[in-house]
């Protein structure tokens, strides 16, 4: 398991993994990227299904 930083300078696919750590580190960035995390997770699921 890799450790990601609240998807700050990482790709959207890597930002969908951390969610609890994101809350711990940088709350502003996490809150602003929270939507991106949800989008990322939904896209990753659709990509795996198709």
Swiss-Prot record:
Signal peptide: none
DNA-binding found in the keyword field: yes
Alphabetical keyword list: Chromosome, Developmental protein, Differentiation, DNA condensation, DNA-binding, Nucleosome core, Nucleus, Spermatogenesis
Protein's cellular compartments: Nucleus; Chromosome
Predominant place of localization: nucleus
Tissue expression from the record: Testis.
One GO-annotated biological process of the protein: sperm DNA condensation
GO cellular component, one term: nucleus
One Gene Ontology term of the molecular function aspect: DNA binding
UniProt KW DNA-binding keyword: yes
Alphabetized Pfam families for the sequence: Protamine_P1 (PF00260)
Family from the record: Belongs to the protamine P1 family.
Role according to the record: Protamines substitute for histones in the chromatin of sperm during the haploid phase of spermatogenesis. They compact sperm DNA into a highly condensed, stable and inactive complex.
Protein name, UniProt field: Sperm protamine P1
Organism: Trachypithecus phayrei (Phayre's leaf monkey)
């Amino acid at each position: 398991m890799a450790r990601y930083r609240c998807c700050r300078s990482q790709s959207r696919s890597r930002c969908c993994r951390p969610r609890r750590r994101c809350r711990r580190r940088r709350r502003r960035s996490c809150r602003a990227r929270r939507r991106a995390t949800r989008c990322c997770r939904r896209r990753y699921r659709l990509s795996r299904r198709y």
